[in-house]
């Protein structure tokens, strides 16, 4: 069976993954051996009228509540389409799901969407599949090899690890930031840039070295 990576991104009505409703969701199915996109989707859905939205969220993703009311899918319809599409993709081979800050948001958001729509088995990301988050990988890469990634500094002189900033500074700018499709393409480009085989090998050696030191300190 072939190995694939599913890059995904969601735009929502809130920054709270438990109470947010998805208004736009993109997935790219990429074959690992040649990084070719073999399938993709972008679904637009209507938020539930029982949920409050955050104005800030709409200001970020560029949607308006009047626009999202006209989207094709209901929240339940979106949950069904995501379940069907990801299940179909899983039948092609082994999948690795990747989202930027996915551990803290996108994976939880999607699973909560399935759960709140009474799907009895919302753990599709971790069953016969694996999860990946490019954000901590980028942080580790930059820590061990600062020359790998260019990062901007905020007003406090701290490094910024926002997706749009990293993509813009490293040669593959996002056409329209905070749209699910363009952010997903940017995530794919960023991930492929920092996960080259030689860089991963060096990072693995550094990680193992730190682990061995920790084991010696604690007598493990």
What are the functions of these language-model segments?
Residues 2-117, 157-168, 172, 178:
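Conserved non-catalytic scaffold segment of RNase H-like nuclease domains
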Residues 10-14, 136, 186:
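Short, glycine/acidic-enriched loop or turn micro-motifs at the edges of active sites
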Residues 15-17, 139, 189:
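Conserved protein kinase catalytic core
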Residues 20, 120, 144:
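Catalytic phosphate/metal-binding cores of nucleic-acid and nucleotide-processing enzymes, i.e., regions
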Residues 115-128:
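A short alpha->loop->secondary-structure connector
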Residues 131-154:
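Short alpha-helix plus adjacent loop in nuclease-associated cores
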Residues 169, 181, 185-220:
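Acidic two-metal-ion nuclease catalytic site recognized across multiple nuclease folds
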């Amino acid at each position: 069976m072939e190995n694939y990576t599913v890059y995904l991104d969601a735009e929502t009505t809130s920054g709270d993954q438990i109470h947010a409703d998805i208004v736009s969701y993109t997935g790219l199915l990429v074959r690992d051996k040649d990084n070719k996109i073999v399938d993709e989707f972008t679904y637009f859905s209507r938020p539930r009228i029982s949920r409050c939205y955050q104005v800030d969220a709409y200001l970020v993703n560029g949607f308006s509540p009047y626009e999202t009311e006209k989207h094709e899918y209901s929240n339940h319809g979106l949950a069904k389409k995501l379940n069907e599409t990801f299940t179909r993709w899983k039948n092609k081979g082994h999948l690795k799901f990747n989202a930027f800050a996915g551990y803290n948001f996108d994976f939880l958001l999607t699973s909560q969407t399935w759960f709140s729509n009474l799907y009895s088995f919302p753990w599709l990301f971790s069953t016969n599949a694996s999860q990946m988050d490019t954000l901590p990988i980028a942080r580790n890469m930059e820590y061990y090899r600062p020359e790998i990634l260019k990062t901007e500094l905020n007003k406090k002189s701290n490094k910024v690890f926002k997706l749009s900033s990293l993509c813009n500074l490293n040669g593959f700018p996002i056409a329209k930031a905070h749209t699910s499709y363009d952010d997903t393409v940017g995530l794919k480009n960023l991930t492929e840039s920092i996960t080259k085989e030689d860089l991963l090998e060096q990072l693995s050696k550094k990680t193992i070295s730190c682990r061995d030191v920790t084991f010696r300190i604690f007598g493990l």
